[in-house]
Design a protein with these regions (language model features):
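Cysteine protease catalytic domains with a Cys-His-Asp triad
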Residues: 1-99, 103-110
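Cysteine protease-like catalytic core of ubiquitin/ubiquitin-like
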Residues: 63-168
């Protein structure tokens, strides 16, 4: 049974709502729903990407991404908001932590908000590197600087998704 529907591809079911109970992890569908809602509220010049898109950015090659993401016109935005997960697998569920990466397009800078810093540092840097290439700020290899933002830290192993919603 679908409880909430937002847009054509974003819905939340009863089993997802149950995850909002204390001590449970938020799943991809809840984060996607919130990012879609936030995108609707923010409008341009902010682009809130969902977990699936960010995961694809982390795993795919830049040429494939350019073709698939060109319609988003990311270079024309002011802020890009990306939820980051540390799942290293492209073919199955996984991952144990969410954080948030914010790209400020006018200054070509990346900022990471991690409630269990520096747990997702490498994952955020990987996505930032791909984003810099997608936005044509740099080509090839080379370090992309991601500025860690001082932010509240979680006190348990389950609240990272809630913190991502808060930071976004």
């Amino acid at each position: 049974m679908v409880w909430f529907v937002y847009g054509e591809e974003c819905n939340v079911e009863a089993q997802d709502v149950d995850l909002c109970a204390c001590g449970c992890w938020l799943n991809d569908r809840l984060l996607a729903f919130y990012m879609a809602w936030l995108q609707h509220r923010c409008r341009a010049p902010v682009l809130c990407l969902g977990p699936a898109t960010t995961f694809w950015i982390a795993l795919a090659d830049v040429d494939t991404l350019r073709g698939g993401l060109s319609r988003l016109e990311m270079a024309d935005k002011e802020l890009l908001i990306l939820p980051i997960n540390n799942n290293p697998y492209g073919d199955r569920p996984g991952g144990t932590h969410w954080s948030l990466l914010v790209c400020h397009v006018p200054t070509k800078t990346f900022h990471s908000l991690d409630s269990a810093a520096p747990m997702n540092e490498e994952c955020a840097r990987n996505v930032a590197h791909k984003m810099a290439q997608l936005l044509r700020w740099r080509e090839g290899e080379g370090e992309v600087e991601v500025h860690p933002v001082s932010c509240p830290q979680q006190k348990n192993g389950a609240d990272c998704g809630v913190f991502v919603l808060l930071y976004a």
